[in-house]
Amino acid sequence: YTLSNTGAYGEHGPTTVGLSGHKAIPLYGSAEAYRFRYDVVYTNRMSAGAYRGYGATQGIFAIETSVNELAEKLGMDPMEIRMKNMVKEGQFMPAYYGETANSCALDKCLARVKEMSGWDEKYPRKVMPDGKIRSVGVALAMQGSCISNVDVGSATIKLGEDGVYNMSIAAADMGTGCDTILAQMAAECLDCDLDDIA
């Protein structure tokens, strides 16, 4: 249950807190039962509408903390419990508007994270020569960039006379790195250097 203080104005109160459940619960497609309830209250406080993460971050924090606690109670590796229960490609997601995960490589991504982080060597903890303890942690998250079946996005790439590709996108880079990331994706698809994308 979530009680959300949305401030003195309507803003996006219900949709923001609603997404805290709809973006967190579907991460675990094997869940056969779930319940998500919330209330939004209006108070004489500053407006608390949509902002970075649009509600998803709060729900993901709650779910992922619970999964870690569950793994501890079961005596399981937190990485393993996620690998066994996370949503996989082709899986129906009743908690996400009845959508099917048609494009999902979360399992491959998490396997790569496990490998690159040296999880097996570092979990549950590693005692350093100086007596300090180091450990690793894991959490899953998903954040869509639109409202399913409503919002659409596109990118246009044109090849200039100088041999440089000009990419036009409708995304504003507000510190998220999307300009770099999208240029890297385009360079990989076009088999060219990153400097060839403008």
Residue ranges and their predicted role:
Residues 1-57, 130-198:
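Gly/Pro-rich active-site capping loops and adjacent beta-alpha segments
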Residues 76-80, 121-124, 192-196:
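Short, surface-exposed acidic
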Residues 58, 62, 66-77, 109-120, ...:
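Stable alpha-helical structural segments in soluble proteins, enriched in small hydrophobic residues
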Residues 85-164:
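Helix-loop-helix junctions that connect adjacent transmembrane helices in secondary transporters/permeases
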Residues 1-21, 73-111:
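Molybdopterin (Moco) oxidoreductase catalytic core of the xanthine/aldehyde oxidoreductase family
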